[in-house]
Amino acid sequence: MRDYLRPDEVDAMVQAARKSGRHRVRDATIIMMMYRHGLRTAELVALRWQQVDLKAGYLDVHRVKHGHDAKHPLRGPQLRLLRELQRTYPDSPYVFVSERKAPLSPRSIREIVARTGKLAGLPFVPHPHQLRHACGYYLASRGHDTRAIQDYLGHRNIQHTVRYTAMAPHRFENFWDD
């Protein structure tokens, strides 16, 4: 089994989350943010609103594994979901909370990702780290520089990033002009 999700699978999960359950906005936002920002589960559950600048469209990502913190751009779909989520839970300092307004646990995130994958009709049970890997593989497939991907994902060691570029389907296409 592959260790990442394809973009179409992630899109299916976001759409499935948006259509199901009373936490549809929260769950869709979780899937999208983990994918678009390569967030680890611990980074996601610790995410606070003070790290999110909805006006300027930026997210301050604090990496947990001694990586490099970074400021990531937030784009249209993420901004819309985050604004809607903030209206739903206006009093919490945490972005992703339970009904009791406590931060979600890593176990809850695993359950949300698994449930959303099932709702999306995936033939396997996805886990949260597959969304992080999906981010890396997607960025590599778009031809982004390995060092830039390393910084974006907060990898200290570039060897952790090289795995994504090694499988990029178009990595040799522009080596020769003729």
Describe the residue ranges of each PLM region:
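Conserved catalytic core of the tyrosine transesterase superfamily
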Residues: 1-178
